[in-house]
Design a protein with these regions (language model features):
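N-terminal low-structure segments adjacent to metalloprotease catalytic domains
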Residues: 1-93, 311, 323-357
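Acidic, low-complexity proline/glycine-rich segments
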Residues: 8-25, 136-150, 224-230
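Hydrophobic (often cysteine-bearing) scaffold residues that line and stabilize catalytic clefts
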Residues: 52, 121, 166, 171, ...
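Auxiliary, metal-adjacent structural segments of Zn-dependent hydrolase domains
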Residues: 52-153
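Post-HExxH zinc-binding segment in Zn-dependent metallohydrolases
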Residues: 118, 125-133, 185-238, 242, ...
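Short pre-active-site segment immediately N-terminal to the catalytic Zn-binding motif
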Residues: 154-173
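Active-site recognition of the HExxH zinc-binding catalytic motif
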Residues: 169-185, 317
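Pan-zinc metallopeptidase signature
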Residues: 238-357
Length: 357
C-alpha cells in the first residue's frame, strides 16, 4: 500500500471545522523525526516485520482457536509523519457527521477557531506519534483490511533504549496488533458496532450555545450531592448527559475487552515464543512510570485511566478462561449482545452466568 500523499488530509469536507494542515504540521514538530536509522536497519526492520506478522497470525489463531476471514495480516513500516497523516485522515472520517451539523448551524466558522482546533488535535497526535509502536487501524477502507502499522523509529528507539533483542521485541509487538486483526476478522460486525458508538456519541452532542453551560451546572449540582460517585471515573463524565454516559460505558467496556484480550493473548503466546519477554515487560513498566511534564500530559489525556481500563479487561479475560476455557471466552465474538457490560468487566462471573455458562 502506498503512503498517503501529503494533501490527503485535505480531501474531506470536515476540513472546514479544523485546520488539518496545522494539525499535521504541529504534530510533526511535537513528534520530531525520531532516532537516526540507517538504510540497512530500516530494510532489516521491514523484512523482520513482514515475516513476524505472518508468524504472529499463525500463533494467535492457533492459541485462541479464532480464524480471521479476509486477507492475512500485512505489515506497513512507517515513519512518524506517515502515522500522523493516516490518523488525521481517520479522525476526519470520524468527525464528518458532527462537522455537517456544526456547519449547518454556523457555516462561517472563523479561521482562528479552525486553527485552534487543529492545534489541539496536532498536539495530541504529535505526543502519541512519539510513543506508538504498532496499530491495527479499524477504520481503514475495506481494501486495506489486514494492514498493520508499525512506527519504525519508535520500535528501534525502544529496542536501543532498553537493550532488547530486536526480533523478540518485534514479534511481541506483532502478536498484540495481529490479535486486533483477528478480533475484527472473526467478528466483522465489530467495526460497524464501534463506528455506530462513535456516530451515536457525536450525534448526541448539542451544538446549542447554552447546552454546555447547562450540563456544567447540572454536573456541579450532582457532584455536590454525591462527591464519591465520581471518584475514579474522570472529570470528563461530569460534562456528559445521561445518554452520553451510557454510550461512554458501552465504549469503555468494549475497549476494555479488545485491549484486555490483546494483552492476554500477547503475554500468553509470547511466554512460549519470545525468550526476552521478561525484559520487555520490565521496559514497558519503566516507560509507563514516566515523571515530569510527560506525566502531566498523560494525566490531561486520561492515559492512566486507559491503562487501568485495559488491565481490568485482561483480568476479565483471564477469569473467563479460567472458568470456561477459550471456547467460553470466544462466545464474546458471536454478536454485540455477547459483549460484556462495564459491570461485567469488573465482575466476570456475571458475564459467564449470562453468556458463557
Amino acid at each position: 500500500v502506498a503512503p498517503a500523499p501529503d494533501d490527503a488530509v485535505l480531501a474531506f469536507p470536515a476540513e472546514r471545522i479544523a485546520d488539518w494542515s496545522t494539525a499535521v504540521d504541529l504534530a510533526k514538530i511535537v513528534a520530531g523525526p525520531g532516532p537516526a536509522v540507517t538504510a540497512d536497519d530500516r530494510a532489516q526492520l521491514r523484512a523482520d516485520l513482514t515475516e513476524l506478522t505472518a508468524l504472529a497470525q499463525d500463533e494467535v489463531q492457533g492459541f485462541t482457536g479464532l480464524t480471521a476471514g479476509g486477507p492475512g495480516a500485512r505489515a506497513w513500516v512507517m515513519g512518524r509523519g506517515d502515522w500522523i497523516r493516516r490518523n488525521t485522515v481517520g479522525l476526519q472520517r470520524l468527525m464528518e457527521p458532527l462537522a455537517v451539523r456544526l456547519l449547518e448551524a454556523k457555516p462561517d466558522r472563523s479561521a482562528i477557531a479552525r486553527k485552534a482546533l487543529g492545534a489541539q488535535v496536532g498536539s495530541i497526535l504529535g505526543y502519541v506519534a512519539r510513543r506508538v509502536l504498532g496499530q491495527y487501524d479499524v477504520f481503514l477502507p475495506a481494501d486495506d483490511d489486514g494492514l498493520i502499522y508499525y512506527v519504525g523509529p519508535n520500535m528501534i528507539d525502544f529496542e536501543r533504549r532498553y537493550g532488547l533483542e530486536p526480533r523478540d521485541f518485534r514479534l511481541w509487538v506483532a502478536i498484540h496488533e495481529v490479535t486486533h486483526r483477528v478480533q475484527f476478522g472473526v467478528a466483522p460486525w465489530l467495526r460497524g458496532y464501534l463506528g455506530g458508538l462513535v456516530d451515536e456519541y457525536l450525534g448526541s452532542i448539542s451544538i446549542e450555545g447554552g447546552a454546555l453551560t447547562g450540563q456544567l451546572r447540572h454536573a456541579v449540582d450532582e457532584l455536590q450531592r454525591d462527591r464519591s460517585a465520581w471518584e475514579g471515573l474522570g472529570g470528563v463524565l461530569l460534562l456528559l448527559t445521561p445518554p452520553q454516559r451510557e454510550i461512554f460505558a458501552r465504549t469503555q467496556a468494549m475497549m476494555s475487552l479488545l485491549e484486555g484480550h490483546a494483552s492476554y493473548v500477547m503475554n500468553e503466546v509470547a511466554a512460549r515464543s519470545v525468550p526476552d519477554l521478561a525484559r520487555i515487560q520490565r521496559a514497558l513498566a519503566e516507560r509507563r512510570s514516566t515523571r515530569g511534564v510527560e506525566q502531566a500530559f498523560q494525566r490531561a489525556i486520561a492515559f492512566d485511566q486507559k491503562v487501568a481500563q485495559y488491565a481490568a479487561g485482561e483480568r476479565f479475560v483471564r477469569e473467563v478462561v479460567a472458568r470456561g476455557g477459550q471456547d467460553a471466552l470466544n462466545q464474546v465474538w458471536s454478536s454485540s449482545s455477547n459483549l460484556p457490560t462495564r459491570d461485567e468487566v469488573a465482575e466476570p462471573a456475571r458475564w459467564v452466568t449470562r453468556v458463557g455458562g
